[in-house]
A protein has these predicted regions:
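Non-catalytic DNA-recognition/assembly elements of restriction-modification systems
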Residues: 1-25, 158-200
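Short coil/turn segments at secondary-structure boundaries
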Residues: 25-34, 133-135
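A short beta-sheet element
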Residues: 41-42, 67-123
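Short, solvent-exposed alpha-helical surface patches in well-structured domains
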Residues: 117-120, 130, 151, 161-165
């Protein structure tokens, strides 16, 4: 925290386009396969991105009653509870996504800040450490709230510099994906060699 404070005097609250809010609760009767909205639960963001296919569909009646709890492109959804999930984030990248976020998450909408840069920052050891030391409760009953998160430091660098860093991250991710593909190819070759030996 002190190291971040030396880097920036700005807080998340200084870059919010609107207050951070918690999501909506749901009951089994609210699910409806004929609905148009996905329910963004903690389980759907546990892999650091929104898993569209695993998200339940809620009824249109429910969705209409929770219109203030919807998401749009560039929103960041932060899990606020659960021992293994608290602090995990997902960036909403689909402009056409219709979604309602769960009450155990919070929605962060930023202005004058690159949302993807913020997303990667929220994934850093620094930010996750802040979640760890400021969360309340024990085990799966741990929680953190918007009033706390809004006061966390946020790196204050020009947007063009944020974009440069995001591009650098993308390049590194692409390298990693190529390495993974190469390892997979080698594994297949090894499997084939072993299978050939067995079949002789």
């Amino acid at each position: 925290m002190d190291e971040l404070k030396r880097t920036t005097t700005k807080r998340i609250k200084h870059f919010l386009s609107e207050p951070i809010i918690l999501g909506a609760s749901v009951s089994p009767s609210d699910y409806d396969e004929d609905g148009n909205y996905r329910y963004i639960s903690m389980a759907t963001i546990k892999s650091w991105k929104f898993d569209f296919d695993s998200a339940n569909i809620v009824s249109d009646v429910y969705s209409e009653s929770k219109s203030a709890k919807t998401v749009k492109k560039d929103d960041i959804i932060l899990a606020r509870s659960g021992e293994c999930t608290i602090g995990k984030v997902a960036l909403i990248e689909d402009e056409d996504l219709k979604g309602i976020f769960v009450d155990f998450t919070m929605r962060i909408r930023l202005k004058d800040y690159n949302p993807e840069f913020a997303y990667y920052y929220f994934r850093t050891t620094y930010f996750q450490y802040l979640i760890e030391i400021y969360k309340k409760g024990l085990g799966n009953n741990t929680n953190i709230f918007p009033i706390v998160v809004r006061e966390f430091p946020l790196i204050d660098i020009p947007v063009y510099e944020q974009e440069r860093i995001v591009a650098e991250i993308h390049a590194e991710i692409n390298k990693q994906e190529k390495l993974k593909a190469g390892i997979s190819d080698i594994q297949q070759q090894i499997d084939q060699i072993v299978e050939d030996c067995i079949s002789q």
